[in-house]
From Swiss-Prot:
It is linked to Premature ovarian failure 2B: An ovarian disorder defined as the cessation of ovarian function under the age of 40 years. It is characterized by oligomenorrhea or amenorrhea, in the presence of elevated levels of serum gonadotropins and low estradiol. It is found in: Cell junction, Tight junction. One of its GO terms (molecular function) is actin filament binding. This is Protein POF1B. The keyword Zinc does not apply. One of its GO terms (biological process) is actin filament organization. Its main location: other. It comes from the Eukaryota. InterPro entries: POF1B, POF1B_HlH. Plays a key role in the organization of epithelial monolayers by regulating the actin cytoskeleton. May be involved in ovary development. It comes from Homo sapiens (Human).
Length: 589
């Protein structure tokens, strides 16, 4: 909130008038200082300062302004500027009646001081009525240009467009001694209107004491003499002082304190309801802090014989004290609930961390088992591949042996066929020899023919013997080869039987390995399914550890973070989590 403050206090006494002194201003800063014609004196012992009145109101309220009697208004350069703002008077005919002071309200942009007509001037100095009081009034004008940042100050009771004047009147009362006459004192009221750029101060010198002047610097260096407004223009150039006498001490206006206390009470109540709302949002138990006889207790604490305004102010104060007590209890209960919820959260977090560590250990164990299963499966596949390759080699060798056996059988059948042909030829030759012998015996009977026949017979017999011997050798050779072939075939058949037996063993081992691989693949799929489904299905075999724990699903402290959080009282619903830990380890056969 940007505001401008102006204050002026003056202490005047009887004496000759000096020329008014113009106090220059320094821009963008406000300074309050004192000037004195002599050295600063120690504080007076017989002077008592008493705060008489404090009043606040909007800009449309009547503000008392004083000016010399029947004086014309002298417009200063300050009033002609565009930034000058005037007060708006609510009633132009209102007058404040006093035995010694007549104050009238005027139109905007005018300031008047009405002097009592009974006062006279008999000398160049002003004749002052003996009045043992000096009133010092202070005006503070605030111009709030924006709303306060706090959300508790925003509401229907805040009007950012109104300028508020705080009038602070301080009476300086001088104690009079019995043996000493009354020193004439003067009372002056200086009213500073909103946004003055230059403040002028006129001081009068007193023979007995020094004159102190307190001024305030504004923003612009424009200056005028306030003496033009307080002095009459005449030949003697005598300054007429205003003599103000009050009826007595002004009464304290209770409206300001009443409004202030009411505003504080409303803000205290809003704070209490805000705390109560937050306590309900986090799920705390709403305790009944209100007592039935609270109003009776407040009324009993108010003393009797006071005015209604004072009673109302005391009532506001007592209500604010009770509301502050309730707010304190609500804050303490809220902190206790938050501490309890944080304890629950910490316990749940520790249990979840422990479960997470156990699950990670179980998962690492299953990962090692899975790696062992994969290594075993890879070794089984390599052995199976080697066995299949050896089986293919043995089957190719068996096929080659069978082909050789078939070729030997074909050669043996050919040799038997040739042997039969040779026997048939032998029979034909014997038959032909016999026929020739019969012909020769029939036709020729001499010794030469007999010799020729013997010779031919011998020749044929030798030829037959040679041929028989040759054929016998060939038959023996073929038989030996056939026996050798039979032996080779029998050996090869034995090796084939060995191969067949070994092949049968390999096929049986392969079937066992296939069944083992199927079983391990099923277990592996189950393990993967358990890993993916987060241990929803129990694994077959092995040792299984089941851990059952209950966790709270509602945390009311989260209501402070989310507006749409719905609190469910504890104990109504809990979630049960079952943790299964399996320890299955495969051993290689």
């Amino acid at each position: 909130m940007s505001s401008s403050y102006w204050s002026e206090t003056s202490s005047s006494s009887c004496g000759t008038q000096q020329l008014p002194e113009v106090l220059q201003c320094q821009p963008q800063h406000y300074h309050c200082y004192h000037q004195s014609s002599q050295a600063q004196q120690p504080p007076e012992k017989n002077v008592v300062y008493e705060r008489v009145r404090t009043y606040s109101g909007p800009m449309n309220k009547v503000v008392q302004a004083l000016d010399p009697f029947n004086s014309r208004e002298v417009l200063s350069p300050l009033k002609t500027t565009s930034s000058y703002q005037n007060l708006v008077w609510s009633d132009h005919s209102q007058e404040l009646h006093s035995p010694t002071l007549k104050i009238s309200t005027c139109a905007p942009s005018t300031l008047h001081i009405t002097q009592n007509t009974e006062q006279e001037l008999h000398s160049p100095t002003v004749k002052l009525t003996t009045y043992p009081q000096t009133t010092i009034r202070k005006y503070v004008v605030q111009n709030p240009e924006q709303e306060p940042l706090s959300q508790f100050l925003r509401g229907s009771h805040f009007f950012p467009g109104n300028n508020v004047i705080y009038e602070k009147t301080i009476r300086k009362v001088e104690k009079l001694n019995t043996d000493q006459g009354c020193h004439p004192q003067a009372q002056c009221h200086h009213h500073i209107i909103q946004q003055p750029q230059v403040i002028h101060s006129a001081h009068w010198q007193q023979p007995d004491s020094s004159q102190q002047i307190q001024a305030i610097t504004g923003n612009n260096p424009i200056s005028t003499h306030i003496g033009n407004e307080l002095c009459h223009s005449g030949s003697s150039q005598i300054c007429e002082q205003v003599i103000i006498q009050d009826d007595g001490p002004e009464k304290l206006d209770p409206r300001y304190f009443g409004e202030l206390l009411a505003d504080l009470s409303r803000k205290n109540t809003d704070l209490y309801h805000c705390l109560l709302e937050h306590l309900q949002r986090i799920g705390g138990s709403k305790q009944d802090f209100e007592s039935t006889d609270e109003s009776e207790d407040i009324e009993s604490l108010i003393p009797k014989g006071l005015s209604e305004f004072t009673k109302q102010q005391i009532r506001y104060i007592l209500q604010m004290r009770g509301m502050s007590d309730k707010s304190l209890r609500l804050v303490l209960s809220t902190f206790s609930n938050i501490r309890e919820e944080l304890g629950h959260l910490q316990n749940d977090m520790t249990s979840l961390e422990n479960d997470k560590m156990r699950l990670e250990k179980d998962l690492s164990f299953k990962d090692t088992q899975l790696k062992e299963y994969e290594e075993l499966l890879a070794s089984v596949r390599a052995n199976n591949h080697q066995q299949q390759q050896g089986l293919q080699d043995s089957s190719s060798k068996c096929q080659a042996l069978e082909e050789n056996n078939l070729s030997l059988r074909h050669t043996l059948s050919d040799m038997e066929y040739r042997l039969k042909e040779l026997e048939y030829c032998k029979r034909n030759l014997e038959q032909e020899n016999q026929n020739l012998r019969m012909q020769v015996s029939e036709t020729c009977t001499g010794p030469m023919l007999q010799a020729k026949m013997d010779e031919i017979g011998n020749h044929y017999t030798e030829m037959v013997k040679n041929l028989r011997m040759e054929k016998d050798r060939e038959i023996c050779r073929l038989r030996s080869q056939l026996n050798q072939y039979h032996k080779d075939v029998s050996k090869r058949e034995g090796s084939c039987s060995d191969f067949q037996f070994k092949l049968h063993e390999l096929t049986s081992l392969l079937e066992e390995k296939d069944s083992l691989i199927k079983r391990q693949s099923e277990e592996l799929s189950k393990l993967r399914q358990e890993i993916y489904s987060s241990h929803n299905q129990p694994s077959t075999g092995g040792r299984t550890t089941i851990t059952t724990k209950k966790y709270r699903t509602q945390y009311p402290i989260l209501g402070l973070l989310y507006d749409d959080y719905e609190y469910i009282p504890p104990g109504s619903e809990t979630q049960t989590i079952v943790i299964e830990k399996t320890e299955d380890k495969y051993t290689c056969p």
